[in-house]
Amino acid sequence: MKHMFKNILFHKKGKHDKNDAIKKAFSLFSVPSNENERIIKFWPLKFKEKDEETLYIIKLCDNMYSKKYVILVSHLISLLLMYSVCLIVGNINDLFSVLKLTYILLHTFTAINIILILTLHATHYVEMFKSIKGEIFIFYIMMIFVIWCSWLFILFNNIKDLLPIVVNVNNFLYATYANNKINIVLGFFAYLPIFYLITIIPCRICYSCAFDILFFIMKVAIFSVYYLITMKSYILTDNIFMIISALVGSLFIFVIRYIIEIQRRLSFHNWNKQTKQIIKLKKTLKEEKQKLSTTNIEEIYNLINDSIGNYYNENKKQKETDWSIVNNLEKILNILKEDNLFSPDLKTINKKNYNHIYGYIMDLKKQKEIINDKIGSKEEPEAESESECVDESKEGSQIESIFESISDVKQKKKSDLAYTSSYEEKENEILKYDFNMNMDKENISIDIWNTKFLDRKSPNYDAFIKIGYILLNKYYISNQNISVKILYSLLYEMKKGYNDVPYHNSIHAAMVTKHCSILITSLDTVNILKDNEMAAFLISALGHDIGHFGRTNMFLKNCSNFLRIIYNDKSILENYHCSYLFNILSKEEHNIFKKEDLKTLTNLRQLIIEVILATDMSKHIKILAQFRIKSIKIKSYIEKNIILCLKMIIKAADLSHNCVDWSEHYLWVKRLVNEFYSEGDDLLERGFELNPLFDRKAHNNFIQIQRTFLRELVLPLISSLKTLDTSTITQLMLSHVKRNYSKWTKIEKDETKKEKYLNELLTDVPNSWKIVYAPNLNIYKL
């Protein structure tokens, strides 16, 4: 039975295919026979997709609008010409005295048409037709039909007493006789609105059949009215014959127009399809160009996806599919031989003009070249850089390496978060702070993205404590019955830990924390975190740069700093910030988590460490690649990968000075470039070759570097975050980045502006920016 069913099914399918082939061979329409492939609904004639039908009408209207003056002039000339012909014919045959009502209607009809034409043109009729085209079309047809029938009955009523007794077929068509002198063409005047209707309103829409029906009714009305008037002297069969002839003629015209219109629509569909493909291709190319870099792991992911797509592609032949899959698998095997799966290909980087950007974010060490020996070997450092990059990429992809601070050596019953100091020390320490419990918090809104931290009379140094208090009190302190004094004590101690360096200071930390709060509430992550996890995340943001002394990881590696020895070249600064933060939290007078149990404290500590370590720019590409591969969109995926989402959020907030208004953005850039150049001056004194980012002498290229940074790092990061966005925050960020990028581009093209802005970046520098700070090693005292 089963086999019989299959045979019947395949037999029917074969028969269907055969019929389809015949239809395709003899079809006038040249459309697919498969119902799923058809793009046109044949009755009423329209595209199946509403968007395509709308676009078709818009294109028709736009085409008419571009020729509106030609249409206006041609219709006015045609109307006035027919009007003049009717007047001349009437005067020649002395018809004014006989056909008074007819000529009254002639003048009225002409005036109405002229007013209608001018009104439509004056009111931009094309734009109205785009939205209410169907209603206008039907209304206009009904109006014409009423006017035409009125014309017809008045005409025949005027001349019925003048009609000949014997009527032959040759004189039948309009039968507008006057004293048997001449056939007049007054009847043709009624067809003029139809001519106007075809050209001024797009009849090639789903209402076009109404025109053909009207045309047929007009012809039938002519013959029927004449028959009723001349019933005594005219044969009924002749009238029926003329009506049938009119019907056949109308159907023939309709079918021809119908076929032509289908072909036009198919041509439009092909054009529209190709246009969409070109736009999609351009968009894809643009997105690919804007990508930071395709890492090897992303390449593997894309190749596997491509292979799966080829396997399910029914249009491809089996051999082509097999070859494509095998080719992709060979590429994957070759990529897997590389060590740097989460890093961009170094060969690709070197081909680009912005390899110094990647050199910075990947901590690629530049040549250590002593001034006295400038012509030394230059190949060994390159090898060292490459090996260092490979070594960096060997880190596990699941969880970042967690380096315990030295304060963990002596562990008590609770972790360092719950470490208790003596009561006397606690009392003495608290007395050191002058708590302002009534601090003004109204002038900072935690919900507004564009807060002016720098673009004001003086920088907002109070923002750190104000923002920290508002957010931590909102999400945690108010629910845990913890003393506000402990919160203030923590915030004051953290603020005291920030040095007054140009960029990585407490104001930067306040901005990052505020933007983290906005992002986490605007993205689809806010309801996943518990109160204590939210507090830990905010503490991470507040302390992500604590103790920063205005130098980068690259500097610490080059100079063999003490911190490099402690943290083995792995995220040196970020581990230092973690240690500094936990050193503060280990004291009970600062510990807002002291009511949490040991297991919770361990989890919160791990969250803080992973979030702060994510701000290391050498991990930028890796984190972005992991996020892209996971394609986090569904809430269940977000819950499983919440740490990865938090890493992306703090990274976006850490670079958010690029996502604000130009005036604020420019001031942050000024601080950052001066901090970098200060490091470059220090490196130069020590005899190291400089990356262009830190070279004061390469300042003329700074704008190009800044544009590259925005395009290659910031834009891809924010664009990837859009998958989590449940509001419009990422769109706002992208618009600011693009505006700032455009502003830098315009400045670079104008030499006068370029020189002005470059000079402004390095002038009016406060003396406090020139102070050299050192890491606080007291946090490591046991």
UniProtKB/Swiss-Prot annotation:
EC numbers, comma separated: 3.1.4.35
Composition bias type Acidic residues, residue spans: 381-390
Gene3D superfamilies documented for this protein: 3'5'-cyclic nucleotide phosphodiesterase, catalytic domain
Annotated CDD domains: HDc
Phenotype when the gene is knocked out: During infection of Swiss Webster mice, lack of PDEgamma reduces peak blood stage parasitemia. In the mosquito, development of oocyst sporozoites is not affected. However, sporozoites released from the oocyst have higher cGMP levels, are immotile and fail to invade the salivary glands and, thus, parasite transmission to the mammalian host is impaired.
Gene Ontology CC annotations of this record: endoplasmic reticulum membrane
One GO BP: signal transduction
GO function term, MF aspect, one: metal ion binding
Record-listed a divalent metal cation 2 binding positions: D545
Reactions it catalyzes: 3',5'-cyclic GMP + H2O = GMP + H(+)
Compartments where found: Membrane; Endoplasmic reticulum membrane
Ranges facing Cytoplasmic side: 1-69, 119-135, 203-208, 261-782
Keywords: cGMP, Endoplasmic reticulum, Hydrolase, Membrane, Metal-binding, Transmembrane, Transmembrane helix
Function: Specifically hydrolyzes the second messenger cGMP, which is a key regulator of many important physiological processes. Probably by regulating cGMP levels, required for sporozoite motility and invasion of the mosquito salivary glands.
Protein's UniProt name: cGMP-specific 3',5'-cyclic phosphodiesterase gamma
